[in-house]
Amino acid sequence: MAPKGSERTVKKVVAENRKARFNYEIVDTYEAGLVLTGTEVKSLREGKANIAESYATDEGGEIWLINSYLPEYLQANRFNHETRRRRKLLLSKREVNRLQGAVNREGMSLIPLRIYFNERGRVKLELALGKGKKLHDKRETSKERDWNRQKNRLLKERG
C-alpha cells in the first residue's frame, strides 16, 4: 500500500488509438467504464486489444462502443465472447446528455482514445469529443511536428 501523502496514478494502457489525435481536433475528454464479460477482461489483461477503427455512438439514451476488437481468451472454453461485439459505456446521465447534445447540435464525433486499467484494476476507456480535421489541417500539423523535430535537433547540436 502506498504512503498516505503520495498520489499514485498508475495506468496500464492496453490499447491506444494513435491516429485519433491526428485525424480529429480533440475538444474534451471523458473517462468511461466498460460493461465487459470475464473473458474480455482476461483478454485485456494479456494486453491484446485494438480500438483503431472503433467509434462510439448514442442510442436510446446510452453510449455504445462499436467495432472495438478484443481477441478471444485462449484459455476459455466454449463460453468465450464475441470479438467485435457492441459494448456499453458507463457514464453519468449528465455526461451522456452533454455528449448527445454536442454530437446532435454541433456535429462532433465520439472517439475512443485508449483503454486502460486504473489504479483500482478497473477497465476504463478515455473517450474524446472531437471534430474531424480537414486535409490542410492535417498537413499543417505534420509540418509543425517536423519543424519542432528539426528545431530540437538544431538546439541539441548547439548545446
UniProtKB/Swiss-Prot annotation:
Compartments, as annotated in UniProt: Cytoplasm
GO biological process: trans-translation
Compositional bias ranges of the Basic and acidic residues kind: 137-159
Location, primary (coarse class): cytoplasm
Pfam families per UniProt: SmpB (PF01668)
Single annotated GO MF: RNA binding
Recorded superkingdom: Bacteria
Transferase as UniProt keyword: no
Gene3D superfamilies: 2.40.280.10
Keywords: Cytoplasm, RNA-binding
A GO cellular component entry from the record: cytosol
Region (Disordered): 134-159
Record-stated family: Belongs to the SmpB family.
Entries under NCBIfam families matching the protein: PRK05422.1 (NF003843), smpB (TIGR00086)
Summary of the function given for this chain in its UniProt record: Required for rescue of stalled ribosomes mediated by trans-translation. Binds to transfer-messenger RNA (tmRNA), required for stable association of tmRNA with ribosomes. tmRNA and SmpB together mimic tRNA shape, replacing the anticodon stem-loop with SmpB. tmRNA is encoded by the ssrA gene; the 2 termini fold to resemble tRNA(Ala) and it encodes a 'tag peptide', a short internal open reading frame. During trans-translation Ala-aminoacylated tmRNA acts like a tRNA, entering the A-site of stalled ribosomes, displacing the stalled mRNA.
Protein name, UniProt field: SsrA-binding protein
Phylogenetic placement of the source organism: Bacteria, Pseudomonadati, Pseudomonadota, Alphaproteobacteria, Hyphomicrobiales
